[in-house]
Amino acid sequence: MQQRLIFHVDVNSAFLSWEAARRVAAGEPDLRAIPSAIGGDRDKRTGIILAKSIPAKKFGVTTGEPVGMALRKCPQLVLAPPDFALYTRNSRAFIAICRRFAPVVEQVSIDECFLDMTGTHLLYPDPLAVAHQIKDAIFSELGFTVNVGISENKLLAKMASDFEKPDKVHTLFPAEIPQKLWPLPVGDLLSVGRALAEKLTAARIRTIGDLARTDLAYLQKLTGVRTAALLHNYACGVDPSPVLAEPEAVKCYGNSTTLEQDVTTVPQANQVLLALCDSVAARLRADGRRCLCLTVTIRGSDFKNRSHQRRLPEPSDVTQELYDCAKSLFAEFWDGRPLRLLGVTLSDLTDGQTQQLSLFPDEKRDRARKLDQAVDQLRGKFGPAAISRGPRPPPTHRLHCKFTPKPPDP
């Protein structure tokens, strides 16, 4: 069987790099070379940090912290507003360059993708050399840097790309696991979040090597059977998942937005929920799907997510129906504390042709559906910004509920 060769390409501090590249092209100072960040309002000292430069990181500025706190750490911090249209253009551009080199490319988030380079040895006999070619082509043509990780599977390639940054190429082949992977803290392993890392550390499983050497039966008692199997495989560098050129079957649709200013009232939250429902319902209709379950997610200043979900009486793709459900659900579990993130996810999908009973009176539902159709047609002709129902917050996470290594690394 032919040995696999997988690359993982990850944009370095994507949001900030893309804004910096635009400014450099216009003859302005490079944000990457000074203490700078994306997000929030400097004058009002509101919002949160979405991305930061390496010089800002040296002052202790962290992604996700309030702008006011970041400015106290670094008074000279240069703040730039987010521009998601710019991010989308740059994302498409760097993926297009990757496709010039690889027969199979799987984009897993706005700023990262996997390349299956298996069988390309006649074209590219030296994997390191072609990885540098890809990295250098992206920088020379688009003006921003990436890291490239190289291995025999997606997991190890992803872990390799997270080694020293920026503008680096790293390998992590199976023979290198004891030296490069196992000494890392267990929290650095893909799929190990903060809570799980704390649990493992409390059980004296402090490094990835400790995890690889842990008895599977003990690990099952600690984390559960399925999680234990996944963790043990990942710690040993085992990941058979393929690089998929075509998207996996979508199991749910979701959008969430990190807010520039905290939401503190129900009307503010409802405006955001309307924009999110409008966006995600349009994607649902475009794919000819309907949903039976809606989930609302919130995050406060403690950075902990809370979610509640509700089943709909019948499958729906109508924006107003989904918005009404989201409003009601939000009102049930929000405790009034300021919010920094809101999200809406639609799941339990059915074919769009599935017969629906009427949630609204027929006439009301027909009007709502015709409104959706008119809005979809206008956006299809003039672009997504042609019409909006309420203010549209920029989505920081657009979910299709398939496997992705992690959310974008801003």
Listing of model-derived features with the role each one plays in the protein:
Residues 114-119, 307-310, 356-361:
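Short, hydrophobic beta-strand segments
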Residues 152-155, 233-236, 290-301, 339-350, ...:
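A glycine-rich phosphate-binding loop feature that marks nucleotide/adenosyl-phosphate handling sites
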Residues 188, 196-339:
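DNA-contacting surface of Y-family translesion DNA polymerases
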Residues 314-410:
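Acidic, metal-coordinating catalytic segment for phosphate/diphosphate chemistry
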